[in-house]
């Protein structure tokens, strides 16, 4: 009979006490995980998290208290755990896991790595570091009632990046400024307006009508002419929005009536700005034209205003007059905050700062009204503006428990028993909330864990700069941290160097300036990640508007056409206003893979052939997943399009 130490066999208990574990993230899942680890018998734990504790964390991250607000999550989590398990050996790092100090050798110090992260970039990085160090990684995520845990092992399972994930949703500037069609467009505009008035000004966050919008011009020459007209007509003196606001003493009524600050006789925010947009009549051939607002008319509404909805104040939708008054009150409060900070001070928008949140709520709803959209409650605006998806403490607790169970299998040398486990919102037809699935084998075409990672990128070599190649393609798209790029031209030309000062002069040059053309090959190396990627360049002058590059086949999955995932992804973003989930966070969504199945255990998806495409649905990464984009089994009833189907990884 096996000797037991508590509920565990002695051999396994000894393994727990001697093994070193790295926990990446000390938030919702991380707090539960640290507690579970020490209570299970793990002694040597290192935890890293760059974040500090926020008031909004306290309802579910139980290791933190109000007195800890503003302090390091990792450090406070360590101190809290040691209070009920002083024998544990815990090291805390208040730092980013992407810091070069945490290199492959650092990862090789551990027998297990456990992710409790909330963003894709860090997940990608840890995935690559564990592959390079050949250390098992237990990946996890939650969103509302949904959750998942999976195990990643080099050469035996899919890595985190084996399956393609939809890119983060962004919006063209002309859509935000000229033709908003969804509430999120108005919310983004309102956040831009906050920065233009009270924060750090950014030329990319302009809120006035985009006179150079190509769609508004009858021919391309008109767009160019409009773009320069305001600088050429007469002695117009251009002033910034903030300068004009200061000159008025941040008068709320004047701010309501004026925003674009194209001149000292600037257009009005909800009236003349809109009147100007109406002169760009080509925009409204197939769209409903906006309806200008005027402060005096709104104040005449009086008792006609109604509040929509009942219950908590934040969940009520006010009328136009209510939001106009909220706009006035928030501006007065923000003006006082600026005055207290002194000359030259700036405010930073924070979803947890009531006046800042009130301002964005009011301004965005007034703009929604102008463009004939259903207005939103403060709760809904906050959900979208702050990319917030409600987190549930019990879901985090369940997922953290599953992480430890998978860890025990690995330490007990039972890797073949490891599973990807999904926590569903409702029981499946077999009345199961927790559904285990066999781990998938590596994807042979994965651009991360394949034996020779390779991708093909379509771009315009005459318009793509080296800086864009580095930042948008290699870092943002392919998750590199510090890439070095060499052109395979027989001479070994260095295009990008991670060493500071070596190739900065190349940044503002076009790829064609270095002889890169259709068919050129680039070798990109990230020595921190011990990762090499071969990039095949396809030159194209026919990319869609606002698209700088395309990954052919949407690597690593080369089967679907590029337009297919785009169509699915845009279902929700193109919804009519009335069809949108009340807490939908459509601004910036990231995605994580989750399988919704209806059997006690499913085989590896790689053995399902065509059926797999109907069985898989995407369980989105952060803080944000779109219910309407999820693929369901053909024989399955449609799931409710519910708020909690939005995915945030906590």
Curated annotation (Swiss-Prot):
Post-translational modification comment from the UniProt entry: Sumoylated with SUMO1 and SUMO2/3 and by UBC9. Sumoylation at Lys-237 inhibits enzymatic activity. Sumoylation at the C-terminal lysine cluster plays an essential role in nuclear trafficking.
Single Gene Ontology MF annotation: metal ion binding
Pathway note: Protein modification; protein sumoylation
GO BP terms: brain development; fin morphogenesis; protein sumoylation; regulation of cartilage development; regulation of neural retina development
Entry annotated with the keyword Ubl conjugation: yes
A Gene Ontology term for the protein's cellular component: cytoplasm
Phenotype when the gene is knocked out: Knockout animals show deficient growth, microcephaly, microphthalmia, mandibular hypoplasia and abnormal fins.
Placement of covalent cross-link Glycyl lysine isopeptide (Lys-Gly) (interchain with G-Cter in SUMO1): 237
Residues covered by region (Disordered): 554-650
Keywords: ATP-binding, Cytoplasm, Isopeptide bond, Metal-binding, Nucleotide-binding, Nucleus, Phosphoprotein, Transferase, Ubl conjugation, Ubl conjugation pathway, Zinc
Cross-linked residues, Glycyl lysine isopeptide (Lys-Gly) (interchain with G-Cter in SUMO): 191, 258, 282, 286, 618, 630
EC numbers, comma separated: 2.3.2.-
Residues the entry annotates as binding Zn(2+): 159, 162, 446, 449
Compositionally skewed regions (Acidic residues) per UniProt: 590-603, 638-650
Primary location class: cytoplasm
SUPFAM superfamilies: Activating enzymes of the ubiquitin-like proteins
Catalytic residue list: 174
Modification sites for Phosphoserine: 599
Function: The heterodimer acts as an E1 ligase for sumo1, sumo2, and sumo3. It mediates ATP-dependent activation of sumo proteins followed by formation of a thioester bond between a sumo protein and a conserved active site cysteine residue on uba2/sae2.
Family classification: Belongs to the ubiquitin-activating E1 family.
Subunit and partners: Heterodimer of sae1 and uba2/sae2. The heterodimer corresponds to the two domains that are encoded on a single polypeptide chain in ubiquitin-activating enzyme E1. Interacts with ube2i.
Protein name: SUMO-activating enzyme subunit 2
């Amino acid at each position: 009979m096996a000797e037991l130490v508590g509920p565990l066999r002695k051999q396994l208990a000894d393994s727990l006490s001697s093994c070193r574990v790295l926990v990446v993230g000390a938030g919702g899942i991380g707090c539960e995980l640290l507690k579970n680890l020490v209570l299970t018998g793990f002694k040597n734990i290192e935890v890293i998290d760059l974040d500090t504790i926020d008031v909004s964390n306290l309802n579910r991250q139980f290791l933190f208290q109000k007195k800890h607000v503003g302090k390091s999550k990792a450090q406070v989590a360590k101190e809290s755990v040691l209070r009920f398990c002083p024998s544990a050996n815990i090291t805390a790092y208040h730092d980013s896991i992407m810091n070069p100090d945490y290199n492959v050798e650092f990862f090789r110090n551990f027998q297990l790595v456990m992710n409790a992260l909330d963003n894709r970039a860090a997940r990608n990085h840890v995935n690559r570091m564990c592959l390079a160090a050949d250390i098992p990684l237990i990946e996890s995520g939650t969103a509302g009632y949904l959750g998942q845990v999976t195990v990643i092992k080099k050469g035996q399972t899919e890595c985190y990046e084996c399956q393609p994930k939809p890119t983060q949703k962004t919006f063209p500037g002309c859509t935000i400024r000229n033709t908003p069609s969804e509430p999120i467009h108005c919310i983004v505009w309102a956040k831009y307006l906050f920065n233009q008035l009270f924060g750090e000004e950014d030329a990319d966050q302009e809120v006035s009508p985009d006179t150079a919008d190509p769609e508004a011009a009858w021919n391309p020459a008109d767009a160019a002419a409009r773009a320069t007209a305001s600088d050429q007509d007469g002695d117009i003196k251009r002033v910034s929005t903030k300068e004009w606001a200061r000159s008025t003493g941040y008068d709320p009524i004047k701010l309501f009536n004026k925003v674009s600050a194209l001149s000292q006789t600037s257009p009005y925010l909800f009236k003349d700005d809109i009147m100007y947009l109406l002169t760009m009549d080509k925009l409204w051939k197939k769209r409903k034209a906006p309806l200008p607002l005027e402060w005096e008319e709104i104040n005449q509404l009086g008792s006609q205003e109604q509040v929509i909805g009942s219950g908590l104040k934040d969940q009520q939708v006010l009328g136009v007059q209510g939001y106009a008054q909220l706009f006035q009150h928030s501006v007065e409060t923000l003006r006082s905050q600026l005055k207290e900070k002194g000359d030259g001070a700036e405010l930073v928008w924070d979803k947890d700062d009531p006046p800042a949140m009130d301002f964005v709520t009011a301004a965005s709803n007034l703009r929604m009204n102008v463009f004939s959209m259903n207005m939103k409650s403060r709760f809904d605006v906050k959900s979208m503006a702050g990319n917030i998806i409600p987190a549930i403490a019990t879901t985090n607790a369940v997922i953290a428990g599953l992480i430890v169970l998978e860890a025990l299998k690995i330490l007990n040398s039972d890797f073949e028993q490891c599973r990807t486990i999904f926590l569903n919102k409702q029981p499946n037809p077999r009345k199961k909330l927790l559904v285990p699935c066999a781990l998938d084998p590596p994807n042979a075409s994965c651009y991360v864990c394949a034996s020779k990672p390779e991708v093909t990128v379509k771009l315009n070599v005459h318009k793509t700069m080296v800086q864009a190649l580095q930042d948008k393609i290699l870092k943002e798209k392919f998750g590199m941290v510090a890439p070095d790029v060499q052109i395979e031209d027989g001479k070994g030309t260095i295009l990008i160097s991670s060493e500071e000062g070596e190739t900065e002069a190349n940044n503002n040059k076009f790829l064609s300036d270095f002889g890169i053309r259709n068919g050129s090959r680039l070798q990109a190396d990230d020595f921190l990640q011990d990762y090499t990627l071969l990039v095949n360049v396809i030159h194209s002058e026919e990319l869609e508007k606002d698209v700088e590059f395309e990954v052919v086949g949407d690597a690593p999955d080369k089967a679907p056409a590029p337009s297919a995932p785009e169509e699915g992804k845009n279902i929700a973003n193109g919804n009519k206003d009335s069809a949108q989930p009340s807490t939908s966070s459509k601004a910036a969504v990231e995605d994580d893979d989750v399988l919704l199945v209806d059997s006690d255990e499913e085989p590896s998806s790689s053995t399902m052939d065509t059926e797999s495409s109907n069985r898989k649905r995407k369980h989105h990464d952060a803080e944000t997943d779109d219910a309407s984009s999820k693929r369901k089994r053909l024989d399955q009833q449609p799931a409710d399009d519910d708020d909690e189907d939005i995915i945030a990884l906590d």
